[in-house]
Amino acid sequence: MQTIRKKTMMLMTAFILFLLVAVTPFSSVKATLTRGSDDFDPLVDISVTVTIDKIRAFDKFDQQLMKREYVDWNSDPDFFVKVIINDQEFTSPVWPNMKYINDPNWSATCNVPDDVELVNVVIQLWDANDTGAPDKLCDISPDTGSTSDSKDVELTYSIKTGHWTGDDALGDPSGYGRLNGDDDGSIYQHQSDAELWFTINQTDYDGDGIPYWMEVNEYGTDPTVNNRGEDTDADGVPIEWEWWWGYNPTVAESHATLDPDVDGLNNLEEYRTSQWGSDPFRADLFVELDQMMPSPTGETSTLPEGSKELLYTAYDRQNLVYHLDDGSWVGTGSEMIPFDSLTQDSELDAIYENYFLHGDHHNWRLGVFHYGVVIYQSAVVNGNMFGRNRFQISSHGLEQKKATIPFLNRDVIYGGAYMHETGHTLAIFPIGGHNPNSGAPWQLGWWFWRPYKSCMNYGYIYTTVDYSDGSRGLRDFNDWADMDLTAFQS
């Protein structure tokens, strides 16, 4: 009888414990498990994934030194990537003869110990050599020197926080998840510099990307519920953006007034443009490109693809990351404008009103995007700023320039003109070189302002897709330092 009573008591005790567990909130149970265990995520077996998002060779002819920056002298690069996670090496396929890889579609995943917080990650960018010579390690590191350690990137990833530090970190000059080989000061030096975008994440039970440990120990959210889109502190920005960029999603911040990188975009606008790669701690330059439909005879008024790539390279290597909405984006605002053989100033204003603002003077793009339209021909000039945030270039006039001087490069002509007018929206108005007496070799200004090697100088506008750094004496100007990223909002 005593044995039966003892068994009955044990069963009742077990049942009560079961009920207690069943009614206890899931997040509270998980918090107890975390604090009493070395497992940083008891819901899953943790794997860490490094995803390569974009690669760009900074291959460009620089007027500043009359030399070409390149990765492979004989051809476009044959890029491939090596990723090392906790000493386990992964190698991507080779992307042959490609300077710009916008969708590599490659990642490396490694299972890691669930009870060790820090994971070592190395990223290397290589140019394959099919001639029998050794493959070349490209420079994507901020470190100086010529050793392999000064070219690859070494990171430490935390499975506790979901963030990493090392050669790339939150708030660094090139941006989080973006590597720039020119960060060592080698912009106008030949060091096989390149740009590489990447992300690191880990297995996450609820799929919101926020690690279990952060949800349970910092935010008090349920690690079994996807919290994407939630804004519990009601500051206008969701939890996943605030976590990613190091803000506290449980404490309201004045994101409408915060602009830590002073690029003119407040944090609400940085969040809205994050789908296109913006970073609240690194300067971004957004430009909407509208273009004109072909003429009845088939003449086009578009910005050449090669010009776009030159613009990306020129801005990106200076860590002013260029975002050109040319119609290829998801959520694009770019449009094709009906053909007009001769566009008056008043018609330019109408184009801006109808195709950029769309009649809405509170359009969210106003104050976020510059507006640069390619028309067939202006009635006044082949390129000009017609408002603080807007400008045009005329394809017909630029094609005539190419026809008159055949040795000029068409991509450079368009790229230089587009960058020149963008410069005015950045408040670059140089004293020298930007006048009617400096545009041709038979003019005195051409020779006097030769040290100012910038597309803002009429003597270089069609041969240079770059601004000057002011390093060539008294008759030079530092456009990069003098520009005002907020001027277009005036």
Question: Could you say what each language-model-derived stretch is?
Answer:
Residues 200-302, 307-309, 313, 318-359, ...:
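Extracellular calcium-associated, cysteine-rich motifs in secreted modular proteins
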Residues 33-80:
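C2/C2-like lipid-binding beta-sandwich modules
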Residues 1-34:
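Secretory targeting signatures
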Residues 59-75, 228, 278, 407, ...:
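Short consensus segments that form the blades of beta-propeller domains
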Residues 69-152:
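Peripheral membrane lipid-binding modules
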Residues 22-41, 342, 346-357:
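Bacterial Sec-dependent signal peptides at the C-terminal "C-region" and cleavage site
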